[in-house]
From Swiss-Prot:
Coiled coil start-end: none
Source organism per UniProt: Delftia acidovorans (strain DSM 14801 / SPH-1)
Protein name per the record: Aspartate 1-decarboxylase
UniProt-annotated catalytic positions: 25 (schiff-base intermediate with substrate), 58 (proton donor)
Gene that encodes the chain: panD
Role this protein plays: Catalyzes the pyruvoyl-dependent decarboxylation of aspartate to produce beta-alanine.
Residues found modified as Pyruvic acid (Ser): 25
Localization, UniProt: Cytoplasm
Cofactor(s) it depends on: pyruvate
Length: 126
């Protein structure tokens, strides 16, 4: 049996562009793609912290070191410049590998530069 588990997350990135008439996708600074282990054309889930919108698209490379997060195509109607987003991808993990699976969790500063990398989500407390 396979389970769908969180593979990658880029947490609280700031939207830098919205390009309605671009071909689609989400352009992500290549440094962040590398840190999160997300490849070009990989499906990503995007959750907008500011307005609650959730949508699925695919990742494309944004200029390395630029901090770019550009929501493109029809998804551009789901975000505005300055909105905080969570970008996530998932993987099918075999049951025998679930216990050792470690996602890449990337945390950024206000300029969308990586400041921390974790491999687990802490247990939520009351």
């Amino acid at each position: 049996m396979f389970r769908t588990l969180l593979k990658s997350k880029i947490h609280r990135v700031k939207t830098t562009q919205c390009e309605l008439h671009y071909e689609g996708s989400c352009a992500i600074d290549e440094d962040l793609l590398d840190a999160a282990n997300i490849v070009e054309n990989e499906q990503v889930h995007i959750w907008n912290i500011d307005n609650g919108e959730r949508f699925v698209t695919y990742a494309i490379k944004g200029q390395r070191g630029s901090g770019m997060i550009s929501v493109n195509g029809s998804a551009a109607r789901r975000a505005a410049v300055g909105d905080l987003l969570i970008i996530a991808s998932f993987a099918q993990v075999h049951e025998t590998d679930v216990a050792t699976h470690q996602p890449q969790l990337v945390f950024v500063d206000d300029a969308n530069r990586q400041v921390e990398l974790r491999h687990h989500v802490p247990t939520q407390q009351l």
